[in-house]
Amino acid sequence: MSDLPGIVVTGASGRMGQMLMKTVLASGKARLVGAVERPGSDWVGRDAGAAMGGAAIGVTVTDDPLAAFAQAQAVIDFTAPEATVQFAELAAQARAVHVIGTTGLEPVHLERLAWAAHHAVIVRAGNMSLGVNLLTRLTQKVAEALDEDWDIEVVEAHHRMKVDAPSGTALMLGEAAARGRGVDLAQARVSGRDGITGPRAPGSIGFSAIRGGDIVGEHDVIFAAAGERITLRHVATDRAIFARGALKAALWGQDKRPGQYDMMDVLGL
């Protein structure tokens, strides 16, 4: 077992953090060697397995990420933008693969990730599932095939606790549509229409977000023309799909050169 890659999970106490730890522990392909939480968390100092309500696993939750990363070959990180860029710099120091599922990253954060990627492998994606990445590729292909008479709308739905909108996955799909059309999403994007908006701008790519209940994640890409429409859809019913994809990315990155990669690279799409 000791020759298996060691994985550290950040944001250990969160729903995704716990799912990631359980996925690593059950995989038989990697070892969970660390769990990181913010200073002041009541998880710090506890055994990660016991903190999740199970048996002890011999991994103590820490608030010292660099010490944890130094013992690992990969870090899996679904936290928040400011935390993620700090983790990226520390993972680069430790030369650990950094798998990032954090959404809501702004250009200032991406600049810091680009620096870290000079020294370590970073795999970042708005969504780690195979199905969504296939949907992304299909979205680009359909957008390439259809002209501007077909309007493009991205509609996403998530649980009530999600703090950013549109979702990272929705933006990933929008970027794919924009690439297919040969346009810049920043110029084509229209989000959250309200009030008297006037006619739809030709060539625009619209985004709508729904928040409620415990919806894991639903994404529709709608291509609408006069008299017909095409809807490409993905529904996630279990966030374990994201954890499995993240672990796949962590293992894939072990023999890669420093740089920035995404799930398309991991999946060979």
Curated annotation (Swiss-Prot):
One protein family per Pfam: DapB_N
Question: Which residues does the entry assign to the active site, renumbered to this chain?
Answer: H158, K162
Q: Which keywords fit this entry according to its UniProt record?
A: Amino-acid biosynthesis, Cytoplasm, Diaminopimelate biosynthesis, Lysine biosynthesis, NAD, NADP, Oxidoreductase
Residues given in the record as (S)-2,3,4,5-tetrahydrodipicolinate binding sites: H159, G168, T169
Q: Which GO terms describe its biological process?
A: diaminopimelate biosynthetic process; lysine biosynthetic process via diaminopimelate
Q: What is its EC number?
A: 1.17.1.8
Q: Look up the record and name the pathway of this protein.
A: Amino-acid biosynthesis; L-lysine biosynthesis via DAP pathway; (S)-tetrahydrodipicolinate from L-aspartate: step 4/4
- Name the catalysed reactions: (S)-2,3,4,5-tetrahydrodipicolinate + NAD(+) + H2O = (2S,4S)-4-hydroxy-2,3,4,5-tetrahydrodipicolinate + NADH + H(+); (S)-2,3,4,5-tetrahydrodipicolinate + NADP(+) + H2O = (2S,4S)-4-hydroxy-2,3,4,5-tetrahydrodipicolinate + NADPH + H(+)
Q: Does the keyword Amino-acid biosynthesis apply?
A: yes
Q: Which GO terms describe its molecular function?
A: 4-hydroxy-tetrahydrodipicolinate reductase; NAD binding; NADP binding; oxidoreductase activity, acting on CH or CH2 groups, NAD or NADP as acceptor
Q: Which residues bind NAD(+)?
A: G11, A12, S13, G14, R15, M16, E37, G101, T102, T103, A125, G126, N127, M128
Q: Cross-referenced PROSITE patterns, in alphabetical order?
A: DAPB
Cited PANTHER family: 4-HYDROXY-TETRAHYDRODIPICOLINATE REDUCTASE 1, CHLOROPLASTIC-RELATED (PTHR20836:SF0), DIHYDRODIPICOLINATE REDUCTASE (PTHR20836)
- Free-text function comment from the UniProt entry: Catalyzes the conversion of 4-hydroxy-tetrahydrodipicolinate (HTPA) to tetrahydrodipicolinate.
- HAMAP family found in the cross-reference section: DapB
- This one is known as 4-hydroxy-tetrahydrodipicolinate reductase
- UniProt gene name: dapB
